[in-house]
Amino acid sequence: MDDGKKKSDPKLEQAFSCSTRYIDELLTINNDGLMKTYMSEIYPEELELKHENKDDDQHTTYLDLNIDVVNQELVTSLYDKRDDFPFKIVNFPDLSGNIPNAGSYGVFIAQTLRYARACAKYTDFIERTLILKHQLVKQICNETILIKKLVRWIQGSIKGKIMNKYGHDMTKIMSDLITMSQTNPLYDKHVEYA
């Protein structure tokens, strides 16, 4: 699309103002489907792009995010395309191997921070964290140590303050991470069993 066409049509310019591309992934949510119309004018045909938007442009996946427009607000949650695979994925440290324990438990904190940054809703954060916790426990991590490290991180790290966005105190978060995992076997669905 030439710049003259965009400048002559302010509505068209506005529709593309929040569009972005990272390598082969396009983000054009809430674009009224215009990207599909103009994509061949914007990008060369040799460039194969992934445009993951649903038909109504109110939902898309981009990199590792699900993005939905709900009541005129963007609601994000974590998207991992490996969840869609018809087989189990084995990842993250397995303490039965010859690797240091401290770094392995650090993976839990790093992933929890990533989940908190990506998930707008508390329930999405808890669900992802429970899946990870179960996977790490199956890979010989100690559940009590995981929880203690999480508490220490949330209370002692400036990055742990991100948890404040959910409006729950430490007692509620820990309660949900312990009791929900005991009452809902669905959190084992992504875990590879030995």
Please provide the spans of the model-predicted regions.
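Charged structural interfaces that engage phosphate-rich ligands
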Residues: 1-194
